[in-house]
Regions:
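Terminal peptide-recognition signature
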Residues: 1, 14, 79, 117, ...
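Non-catalytic accessory segments of DNA primases and related replication-initiation nucleases
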Residues: 1-86, 223-229, 234-237, 243-244, ...
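TOPRIM fold recognition
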Residues: 5-10, 21, 139, 170-174, ...
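Short, solvent-exposed polar/charged micro-motifs at secondary-structure junctions
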Residues: 38, 98-106, 139-140, 254-258
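Short, basic/aromatic recognition patches
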Residues: 85-110
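Short clusters of hydrophobic/aromatic residues that line enzyme substrate/ligand-binding pockets
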Residues: 93, 164, 253
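Phosphate-handling DNA/RNA-contact segment within nucleic-acid enzymes
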Residues: 102-210
Length: 290
């Protein structure tokens, strides 16, 4: 589960809910649950894939592989309720209808639907995953569609220097903290490669592609966001990369998207872009706004 690195099939659920350890006992309980006859040749416990280490990249890869395409799921509804549309990010975003959540080591496991995003390194290898547990009851202005639990967002795997990536960066990249923040910017700049580092500390430590020439930093409008932008700017410039910081009017760019609308956001970003990047990355309608 989310705490052990084992994610989501029937055997996992039976083992967790019944407190079983031995594979034969779990298999027997599964047969009883499904009204299946006992097979003549029992499967060997050694044939089962061993559980991945808690929080490891392998656990993250398994979780992402077990998730399903996002379109026409609660994850798509969640993003649309956050103002994020159209969606072009089918590769990085997936959905798990029954993703395990455990508040702490001493609490029982809960099951909630979740948006699953992959974290990758500069070569595109999956190094981690991020989970946003969702509320199947719908959207509200307090939780914004996230599940009513203590920590509805959690990441796992090797995160430092890596990111949730939208598009493949070569010479130009936009980077920020949150997934929804960067997806909000993709509504205006649908072909600009972007990276969500998942936190201010990780944004400051983001590894930059060796071919990068210009970096747009989409900071959050708080002290942590300011510190991350300063640190990343210094690192970029020391590597010979031009760094330009974008600051939202509100707390982050998703708040801007929902509060001022896509047209006003596009007009604000247009004047922050290098002229050739307007023609290269901004949607024609957005580029003509204002």
């Amino acid at each position: 589960d989310a705490a052990t690195g084992e994610h989501g099939d029937l055997l996992d659920i039976i083992r967790e809910s019944c407190g079983l350890v031995d594979f034969h006992d779990v298999a027997d309980e599964a047969r009883r649950f499904l009204n299946l006859p006992r097979s003549e040749q029992e499967p060997s416990p050694n044939s089962a894939r061993p559980p991945a280490q808690t929080g490891s990249p392998e656990a993250a890869r398994r979780l992402f592989a077990m998730s399903q395409p996002m379109m026409r799921t609660l994850a798509e509804t969640y993003l649309r309720n956050r103002g994020i549309t159209p969606l072009h990010e089918a590769g990085a975003l997936r959905f798990h209808p029954r993703c395990y959540y455990r508040p702490d080591d001493y609490s029982p496991t809960e099951i909630w639907p979740a948006m699953i995003t992959r974290v990758t390194d500069l070569d595109g290898r999956i190094t981690g995953a991020h989970r946003t547990w969702l509320n199947p009851a719908g959207f509200d202005l307090v939780r914004l569609g996230k599940a009513p639990i203590d920590t509805p967002r959690r990441a796992m795997g090797d995160l430092l220097g890596n990111a949730v990536r939208f598009g493949v960066a070569t010479d130009v990249l936009a980077a920020g903290e949150g997934i929804e923040t960067m997806l909000s910017l993709r509504c205006v700049l649908p072909t600009l490669p972007m990276a969500a580092a998942l936190s201010a500390n990780h944004l400051a430590a983001l590894l930059l592609p060796p071919t990068l020439r210009r970096l747009y930093i989409a900071r959050d409008n708080d002290a942590a966001g300011d510190g991350a932008a300063i640190a990343l700017t210094e690192r970029a410039r020391s590597a010979g990369v031009e760094a330009i910081t974008w600051t939202p009017r509100r707390g982050d760019f998703n708040e801007d998207l929902r509060g001022i609308g896509v047209d006003v956001l596009a007009a604000a970003l247009r004047i922050e872009l290098i002229p050739q990047d307007v023609a290269r990355f901004m949607h024609v309608d957005a580029a003509e706004t204002g």
